[in-house]
């Protein structure tokens, strides 16, 4: 949960830069920055899922699902940031959103 709060704090501490990246970067070298964050997240999730598979013997979570879960995670933070103008409001909601994401991951990794 603390990592999610830190992400929100950093986004709001650099609000103008994040707004430019998220809403005005088309045509610049930064226009695919969200896809790059998703790719990094997807690689991390792939490693995590493979570790769970190796440790438990459960079936491997497929790449399609890993990709979508990475997208959902990134999109959650972007949506919260773009729709809440005040950091305190975003911080009020980020824990519940993070727990929702974590529980979804746990469900996928334990039911695959």
Task: Tell where the protein language model's regions lie, with residue ranges.
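Well-ordered, non-membrane alpha-helical segments in soluble/globular domains
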Residues: 2, 38, 95-99
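Residue-level recognition of alpha-helical structural elements
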Residues: 26, 30, 58-62, 86-94
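Residue-identity detector for glycine
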Residues: 27, 35, 57, 104-107
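C-terminal peripheral helix-coil segments that are non-catalytic and often amphipathic
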Residues: 13, 43-50, 66-112
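Amphipathic alpha-helical packing segments from all-alpha helical-bundle domains
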Residues: 3-16, 28-53, 64-71
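Short, hydrophobic secondary-structure boundary micro-motifs
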Residues: 19-21
